[in-house]
């Protein structure tokens, strides 16, 4: 049985978000719907989830001492990581002391870098993956590329949104790719993974919920990537029954091996009936923002329901839907959005994240749309996103 207290009262149930971006903001809103007290933590002030939290803190979450201090001060009942760049050793220690880390500290530690989760998937679970090698020096990087072959992809073992990633076609690109990978890691320079290129028809995110009443799957989410980050996503992605069954089997193995309750974003390559594991995030996924319009329970609502120990029951998918990012390029600490009235309409919504500033290219919002089919939904979402004019 789940007992929930009322926010700001002595018996309050407290949730601390480690990472307060747009995904954390939606988790915070779902917690607010249940009267939960929300504490948002990030490395910069006025992050999106801080706008809808009861309190907020600005710290370097890779600093073990600072992380322990804020958790000890706030005494949350649930610690909910939104990003990878966290001192996960400290989370394991705190979990050992009785704190509840979502979905569990082991999952956050294994998935904070690509090495932990790749070794779990390929070497422990025996799941199909791309060929890969790890390297921690430029010399071993050259050896790894030689072993994997061209073309290949290099990524920092700890990065997100395409930072530090390069597609390598020839030896002439190696020096530049190594340097870029060293600059792009979330925790600074360090180890990289070199992956062989997988031939696939499309990529999916299989949003998978591990809850008290078992493992549940959302309809597969298709997406288009550019520069290592998603541009559009849609649901449902059409695929064969056999491929879907295999995708669900892989996702089930991964989330049960990681442990804990919550929603996981399992990324997979699909080629015909074959399915290859790519990555997993033990939290809501950016491509899953489409579920804000496509399902009765969004990925954020499912995450909260699961980690609070509530049954999921069933997930209702309404029909074809899509999301398209609002991705301007400018420099400003006073961003405004014009022409929003022309973007919204029947079956079309806009979410603006409330990020405090932009310096270059940054995702500041998302358009959501339904349609008679996925193709129409994508067109409607992209058109809506393009109509929003970002100024600063």
From Swiss-Prot:
GO process annotations (BP): 'de novo' IMP biosynthetic process
EC number: 6.3.1.21
Amino acids binding Mg(2+): 267, 279
Residues the entry annotates as binding N(1)-(5-phospho-beta-D-ribosyl)glycinamide: 22-23, 82, 286, 355, 362-363
Pathway participation: Purine metabolism; IMP biosynthesis via de novo pathway; N(2)-formyl-N(1)-(5-phospho-D-ribosyl)glycinamide from N(1)-(5-phospho-D-ribosyl)glycinamide (formate route): step 1/1
Domain annotation ATP-grasp: ranges: 119-308
Keyword ATP-binding applies: yes
Reaction equation(s) it catalyzes: N(1)-(5-phospho-beta-D-ribosyl)glycinamide + formate + ATP = N(2)-formyl-N(1)-(5-phospho-beta-D-ribosyl)glycinamide + ADP + phosphate + H(+)
Coiled-coil regions listed in the entry: none
Residues holding ATP: 114, 155, 160-165, 195-198, 203
Keyword check for Ligase: yes
Leading EC class: ligase
Gene3D superfamilies, A to Z: 3.40.50.20, ATP-grasp fold, A domain (3.30.1490.20), ATP-grasp fold, B domain (3.30.470.20)
UniProt keyword list: ATP-binding, Ligase, Magnesium, Metal-binding, Nucleotide-binding, Purine biosynthesis
InterPro entries for this protein: ATP-grasp, ATP-grasp_carboxylate-amine, ATP_grasp_subdomain_1, PreATP-grasp_dom_sf, PurT, PurT/PurK_preATP-grasp, PurT_C, Rudment_hybrid_motif
GO cellular component, one term: cytosol
UniProt GO molecular function: ATP binding; magnesium ion binding; phosphoribosylglycinamide formyltransferase 2 activity; phosphoribosylglycinamide formyltransferase activity
Family of this protein: Belongs to the PurK/PurT family.
Role played: Involved in the de novo purine biosynthesis. Catalyzes the transfer of formate to 5-phospho-ribosyl-glycinamide (GAR), producing 5-phospho-ribosyl-N-formylglycinamide (FGAR). Formate is provided by PurU via hydrolysis of 10-formyl-tetrahydrofolate.
Subunit structure: Homodimer.
Protein name: Formate-dependent phosphoribosylglycinamide formyltransferase
Organism: Salmonella schwarzengrund (strain CVM19633)
């Amino acid at each position: 049985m789940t007992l929930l207290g009322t926010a700001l009262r002595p018996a309050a149930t407290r949730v601390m978000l480690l990472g307060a971006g747009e995904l954390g903001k939606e988790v915070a809103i779902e917690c607010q719907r249940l009267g939960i007290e929300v504490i948002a933590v990030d490395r910069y002030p006025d992050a999106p989830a801080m706008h809808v939290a009861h309190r907020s803190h600005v710290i370097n979450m890779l600093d073990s001492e600072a992380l322990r201090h804020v958790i000890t001060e706030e005494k949350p009942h649930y610690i909910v990581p939104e990003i990878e760049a966290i001192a996960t050793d400290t989370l394991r220690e705190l979990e050992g002391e009785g704190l509840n880390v979502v979905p569990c500290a082991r999952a956050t530690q294994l998935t904070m870098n690509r090495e932990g989760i790749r070794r779990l998937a390929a070497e422990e679970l025996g799941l199909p993956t791309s060929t890969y090698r790890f390297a921690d020096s430029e010399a071993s990087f050259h050896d790894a590329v030689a072993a994997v072959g061209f073309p290949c992809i290099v990524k920092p073992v700890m990065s997100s949104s395409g930072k530090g990633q390069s597609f390598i076609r020839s030896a002439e690109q190696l020096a530049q790719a190594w340097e870029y990978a060293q600059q792009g890691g979330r925790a600074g320079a360090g180890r990289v993974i070199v992956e062989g290129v997988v031939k696939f028809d499309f990529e999916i995110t299989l949003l998978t919920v591990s809850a008290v009443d078992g493992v549940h799957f959302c309809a597969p989410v298709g997406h288009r990537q550019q520069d290592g980050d998603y541009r559009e996503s849609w649901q449902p992605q059409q695929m064969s029954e056999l491929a879907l069954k295999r995708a669900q089997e892989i996702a089930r193995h991964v989330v049960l091996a990681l442990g804990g309750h919550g929603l996981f974003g399992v990324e997979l390559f699909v080629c015909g009936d074959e399915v290859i594991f790519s990555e997993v995030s033990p939290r809501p996924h950016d491509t899953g923002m489409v579920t804000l319009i496509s399902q009765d329970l969004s990925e954020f609502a499912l995450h909260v329901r699961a980690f609070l120990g509530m049954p999921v029951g069933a997930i209702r998918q309404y029909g074809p839907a899509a999301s398209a990012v609002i991705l301007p390029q400018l420099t400003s600490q006073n961003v405004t959005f014009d022409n929003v009235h022309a973007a919204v309409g029947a079956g079309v919504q806009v979410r603006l994240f409330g990020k405090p500033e932009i310096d270059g290219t940054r995702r500041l919002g998302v358009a959501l749309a339904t349609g008679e089919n996925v193709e129409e939904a994508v067109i409607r979402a992209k058109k809506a996103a393009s109509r929003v004019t970002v100024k600063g």
